[in-house]
């Protein structure tokens, strides 16, 4: 926020948001360079002098002033960079500038709506990935039906630009953005639409994520309700871009939602026990009542995507399943509801009754098979789960090799400490431990048995099986009530802002 302060002050002094002139300012591309994940596009003589080249930006801005420079044909894209400019390189730099410029008015609105960082302090716990699981444990154990929905994509480019135009009034900027997006699409015309989205997301992840957030924000502004109240939905607060997880509470009133492109009114029936959760590109809808209302919501989603966003979605792609019979994958876990039945004897005077009770518990399981596939993809084992050596790391020191394996193992243990069955992680720890031993043996050109005979090696590798409870015993005494409670229950951490690369949803 601090590095944008100068440009926010300039924007506040203006009556309207004029973003177009900012694309011709050198400091915008300097900010883009400082945030860019692929900084090589701003470098001159890549691999020799890794310094930000202001000359490249100046030449680009000069060419941008020329008429029809941004209209680039397919033949221009193959031009030799040594004999002239490279249009592909120019497009990547311009897209980085777009990503910085388009965020400025929203940062301005965010800084004015939030009292600097005071309100953001209350959202810190919600930013943790694990904050969603206590919510699921508290709510989903009382629900009966669930619908696991993947938000469809890609969205049409013109609709994407129109969504942005609703928030920012700057016609020249959006004409240029539309021209840039369509030209990029034409360069890759031999790709299908999904492949184009994949290519664009890799070439400029910052701009892609920003546009994708706007798409999700627009669709959720119609169907997703704020936690405290329901209203004619149009999101005003942009704290949505700071929270990684969005979950919303129960609905209390009848709500009518008006969509600008619909010729009819969407009316939502009151259901006090329906919940909506979204993370990344997946949303989960759960309800306690019969699946009638769930089918209503299902058709609302389908009609919205088809009529408002021009995205074809078939009804059979959204399934409504009993929560007790269906497990769904979320954030690297398998979740389902386990029914625990018990019989209670009740006696009243001389009569005795047997009462059967059913208690629902949310069962959160570590997905061992997907984890083994991830380990096999990372070359720690084969597809059958048999550990193999990691020759790429053999050039490092013994301490660095062991530290790398331990860091991966501890991160996985830290992430999956909320699982119902933690013993299933022993197989993952075994694979990493034996892979570490084989890597060290490969480095020293010896067998695994000969390496294990070395003094201290086996004791050092025992850290792979260090239990979380043993770590907690250093913080709390073993005879304390706090340690006993933590020893029995699962532990969710509110400091996990991103998942390990080995943890992913397929």
From Swiss-Prot:
What are the UniProt keywords, alphabetically? Answer: Chloroplast, mRNA processing, Plastid, RNA-binding, tRNA processing
- Please give the GO cellular component terms listed in this UniProt entry: chloroplast
The record ties this protein, via InterPro entries, to: Domain_X, Maturase_MatK, Maturase_MatK_N
What's the main place this protein lives? plastid
Compartments, as annotated in UniProt: Plastid, Chloroplast
The entry's protein name is Maturase K
Q: Which organism is it from?
A: Lathyrus tingitanus
- Main role? Usually encoded in the trnK tRNA gene intron. Probably assists in splicing its own and other chloroplast group II introns.
Membrane-crossing residues?
A: none
Task: Establish whether keyword Protein biosynthesis is in the entry.
Answer: no
Top-level taxon: Eukaryota
Which GO MF terms does the UniProt record name? Answer: RNA binding
Gene Ontology biological process terms, A to Z: mRNA processing; RNA splicing; tRNA processing
* Pfam families listed in its UniProt record: Intron_maturas2, MatK_N
Q: Does the keyword Plastid apply?
A: yes
Family, per entry = Belongs to the intron maturase 2 family. MatK subfamily.
Enumerate the HAMAP family for this protein.
MatK
